[in-house]
Design a protein with these regions (language model features):
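Helix-coil boundary and interhelical linker segments in multi-pass alpha-helical membrane proteins
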Residues: 1-4, 57-70, 119-134, 188-191
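Structural signature of hydrophobic alpha-helical transmembrane segments
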Residues: 3-18, 66-81, 134-147
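Hydrophobic core segments of alpha-helical transmembrane domains in multi-pass membrane transport
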Residues: 6, 13, 44, 49-53, ...
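Generic transmembrane alpha-helix signature in multi-pass membrane proteins
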Residues: 21-29, 87-93, 104-107, 112-127
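C-terminal ends of transmembrane helices
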Residues: 21-36, 83-97, 151-162
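Cytoplasmic-side transmembrane-helix entry/capping segments in multi-pass membrane proteins
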Residues: 35-46, 70-75, 97-109, 166-172
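Ordered, amphipathic secondary-structure segments that act as subunit-interaction surfaces
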Residues: 60-104
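Interfacial loop-to-transmembrane junctions
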Residues: 156-174
Length: 191
């Protein structure tokens, strides 16, 4: 049952974008087309999942050696290495997706949602073991993907909508994001 709480919580209740407001830059930047949003989401799922395992192990070493104060730097280095790996793979096997993601792919390195999940996984108050940390990482990525793909779908529909000129573009995107955020807060009562 604890695993189910982690999964539901990571996707809906504690969604990094819509509940904790982390990862807003790629959320607003890559969510113009569903293809790009899905590609970015899959990359983030991979990075969050693998980073959760590696940073969990790295944190155990940092605690053992008594150097917990370099946790954030160590986690950023792990995330940066994983993002480079993802970038190489996407560039090789899907050049179209690589070009569509553009500058936002390297920005996964500085995506605070990825760092946030790594830090949450090792926070003692959560008490996650390695499996729970991995599940939280993967399903936080799924929540990120859900939010960014939903936003991309909304933005694709908004392009063809009759919107007052002062709301076109970024303003209507923020309005749509705020409504999505309010909808996701309704899941808070589930757990």
């Amino acid at each position: 049952m604890a695993y189910l709480y982690i999964i539901i919580g990571a996707i809906f209740v504690n969604n990094f974008i819509l509940a904790q407001f982390l990862g807003i830059c790629p959320f607003l930047g890559v969510s113009k087309k569903t293809d790009s949003a899905l590609g970015m989401g899959i990359a983030v799922i991979f990075v969050m999942g693998v980073a959760s395992i590696i940073t969990y192990a790295v944190n155990l070493l940092l605690v053992k050696w008594g150097v917990e104060y370099i946790q954030t730097i160590a986690f950023i280095l792990v995330i940066a290495a994983l993002v480079q790996l993802v970038e190489i793979v996407i560039k090789r096997f899907s050049p179209g997706l690589y070009n569509a993601l553009g500058v936002y792919l390297p920005l996964i390195t500085t995506n605070c949602a990825v760092l946030g999940v790594a830090i949450v996984n090792v926070t003692p108050s959560y008490g996650y073991n390695l499996i729970q940390a991995f599940l939280n990482g993967i399903f936080s990525g799924v929540g990120f993907t859900l939010a960014i793909v939903l936003m991309a779908g909304i933005r694709e529909k908004l392009v063809h909508s009759d919107i007052p000129e002062s709301f076109r573009g970024f303003p209507i995107t923020l309005v749509a994001a705020s409504i999505m955020s309010m909808a996701f807060t309704a899941f808070g009562g589930m757990i």
